[in-house]
Each structure stands twice: as C-alpha cells, then as structure tokens.
C-alpha cells in the first residue's frame, strides 16, 4: 500500500484547488460525485458487493507540516493525519487524506482516532450535526485520463476536519453505466 502514498500523495499535495463553479462541473456525471454532500463511502458502497478501507498511515503531525491553505481551513493546529484507500470489490477507488485537529479528538469525537479500517464517512455522517463546507475540486490527471479530486472541510459538533479525496482510474465516478 505504500505505492499509493508514493504515487498519489503528490497529486493531492500539488492539486490546484478551485471552486466547483470555476470548473463548471455541476450537471456532469462526475460532478455529481465530486459535489456529493453526504458520505462518499456510503455512495461508493452502493456500487460494489464488498466495500473495504485499507489504512495506509495514521500519525500525529505538527502544525508546521500543514500547508498554508490547510492552516487557513482548520487552523494552525497539530493534527492526526489519516491516509486510506477506499476499495470496491478489491479495486482501489479513492485515495483519501484526512487532517483531524487534535482539538477535534475530544469528547464524543475522541473515537475518530480509533477508526482503523472503518470508513470515516460512516462515523461522521451518522451524527446529526455533521456538515460539509469549503468544497474545492481539482483535475490532477491529464486530458486523456482525468483524475478528479475534491477537498472539503467537515464539521462534527462544530469541530473541523479536512478531507482530500482523489478518485482513482477504476472508481465508478468515471463509469458511464454506473452513475447514480
């Protein structure tokens, strides 16, 4: 799984994030995926017989490891960094990188540190207070093979976390016959 980190982490790190409006993705098949307001994991689960999460890395990082725009979105704070691959029927569909401020990991949200291979979306979107904002998208691939990504800030009990998701080539976002 370290190959995912080597191959796809730079794509997220170097993504040119833009607002969905600036890329005119609304109304497109892939736009429906990128603009999904609820749990991406639940949506992906509907497209396969077996949905799994492979935990690549989880560690605490210092605020100096955050980019300037990440600090702007969640603050100049130390975080728990979580990297996973979401898989459908054994195929890698999404590489995801989550930054959870340590201050978010208090009270009811302390369990976020113990998710392991459980999808983050399954936990976050069961909470009635969950919401998403600051949604940005990027095309990190080529014209011949686009690799779309999205980044958004999630809130749970008014505590932030930042999720960046890269839709890999085999993801249903690119499949015309599996749109829903």
UniProtKB/Swiss-Prot annotation:
Signal peptide per UniProt: none
GO cellular component, one term: cytosol
EC number: 4.1.3.40
Subcellular location: Cytoplasm
Matches recorded under PANTHER family: CHORISMATE PYRUVATE-LYASE (PTHR38683:SF1)
Described purpose of this protein according to its UniProt entry: Removes the pyruvyl group from chorismate, with concomitant aromatization of the ring, to provide 4-hydroxybenzoate (4HB) for the ubiquinone pathway.
Name assigned to this protein: Probable chorismate pyruvate-lyase
Native species: Photobacterium profundum (strain SS9)
């Amino acid at each position: 799984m370290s190959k995912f980190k080597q191959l796809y982490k730079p794509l997220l790190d170097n993504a040119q994030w833009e607002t969905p409006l600036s890329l005119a993705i609304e109304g497109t098949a892939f736009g429906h995926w990128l603009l999904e307001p609820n749990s991406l994991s639940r949506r992906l689960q509907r497209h396969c017989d077996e949905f799994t999460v492979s935990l690549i890395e989880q560690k605490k990082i210092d605020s100096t490891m955050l980019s300037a725009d990440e600090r702007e979105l969640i603050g100049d704070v130390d975080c728990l960094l979580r990297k996973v691959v979401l898989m459908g029927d054994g195929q890698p569909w999404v590489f995801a990188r989550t930054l959870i401020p340590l201050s978010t990991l208090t009270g009811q949200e302390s369990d976020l540190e113990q998710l392991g291979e459980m999808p983050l979306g399954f936990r976050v979107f069961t909470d009635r207070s969950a919401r998403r904002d600051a949604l940005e998208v990027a095309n990190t691939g080529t014209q011949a093979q686009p690799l779309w990504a999205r980044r958004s800030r999630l809130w749970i009990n008014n505590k932030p976390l930042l999720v960046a998701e890269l839709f890999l080539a085999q993801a249903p976002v690119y499949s015309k016959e599996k749109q829903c």
